[in-house]
Amino acid sequence: GQGDAVHACDALTGNCTDYHAYFIALARSLGIPARFAIGAAIPSERHDGGTDGYHCWAEFWVDGIGWVPVDASEADKHPELADYYFGSLTADRVAFTQGRDLTLVPPQQGPPLNFFIYPYAELDGVPFDGVTRSFAFEDV
């Protein structure tokens, strides 16, 4: 997914980026500040190895509390945990970045990044896609 709320509505399906683009659009339409967050889930039963890729969630602002996480895609997969995922995330999450349409520091010459989870490189100002995209972890 690309985090496109209109696509998610039209297709009636999507991955976590689409679910949370839709949630963020709904929250903002009601005047509730909301933002996109992305990272990975580290399997708690293992002490090292790789993980399958990224996972994202949304956060919305509540005065007096701050940013509250929501994981609508996990709640959809596990309806019995829907209440939990509206305000909590599992402890195995590692957050990488927040926001969309990102400009890096120093700024990339290419367009803003839809979201930033994988290594990004440019050759002569052109995005280079030949970068290895994998995640590995180990207990320290």
Residue ranges and their predicted role:
Residues 1-14:
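Short, conserved helix/loop micro-motifs enriched in His/Cys and acidic residues
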Residues 11, 59, 88, 127-129:
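Alpha-helical protein-protein interaction elements
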Residues 21-109:
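Hydrophobic/aromatic-rich core segments of domains that either
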Residues 64-68, 96-140:
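N-terminal accessory/pre-domain segments preceding catalytic cores
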Residues 15-19:
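Long, well-ordered mid-to-C-terminal structural blocks that present hydrophobic/aromatic surfaces
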